[in-house]
Amino acid sequence: MRVQEKAPGKLYLAGEYAVVEAGYPALIAAMDQYITVTAEKSESGRLYSSQNPSLVLAWKRESGQLSFSMKHPYASIESAMRTAETYAVEQGCSAQGHYHLSVDSELDHAETGTKYGLGSSGAVTVAVIKSLLAYYGLSKHPLVIYKLAVLAQMKLEMTGSFGDIAASSFGGVIAYSSVNRTWLSQAMARQSIKELVDSEWKNLEIRAVQLPMSIQLMVGWTGASASTDQLVQHFLKIASFYKNFHRPWAWSSRHPC
């Protein structure tokens, strides 16, 4: 058995930092560059990525859990695998046997490995989950994929709005408002993955947008990668400062008259 799925990268058109806070929208476009994941039934479990051609990881099942042979740089892939496998079991699938998972990326420079900034972490999470849902014969509805991918990244304590995941899951151009992370963290502590996927998520909005035909996108690349986590933390620090600066009590205490 062999299945292959792909997920596009993303580009924020507006609201890249506003959307980090629940309830604030962003406009995001999926790109025509992809991460492709192939899952093929095999005698032993293996994981390969074009980003590290010389590294082929072995994995196996121990007490119903995935176990990798060594430490590796594929935290997003492993978390996506674990999340998809757990969901498959909760859906009544028999997650037994092994498969070879192959990841091929168009979202980084082929020679240097430098990322283009098109949401490779989100895209690879989505592509892995799509491929394993197909492997187990489960629904690949974009909202199901989005929720599973978000849960996989939440387990890694990744920051950001998950807008890249939304764009990779739904494709096209979307208007997106992020889920309330506090609510989701609390829900994850008391609900199964299936229950979370089946529930309505607080503040989450994903809507397809049709741009005018007269609009053409021209994308430039700086040639340097950037850390989403670091940029988001910097934004949140500034946002927190200005929220405190504008609090009414701060002004009234300075101007008692």
Feature-to-residue mapping (PLM):
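Solvent-exposed beta-strand sheet faces enriched in polar/charged residues
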Residues: 102-104
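Residues at or immediately flanking beta-strands
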Residues: 98-100
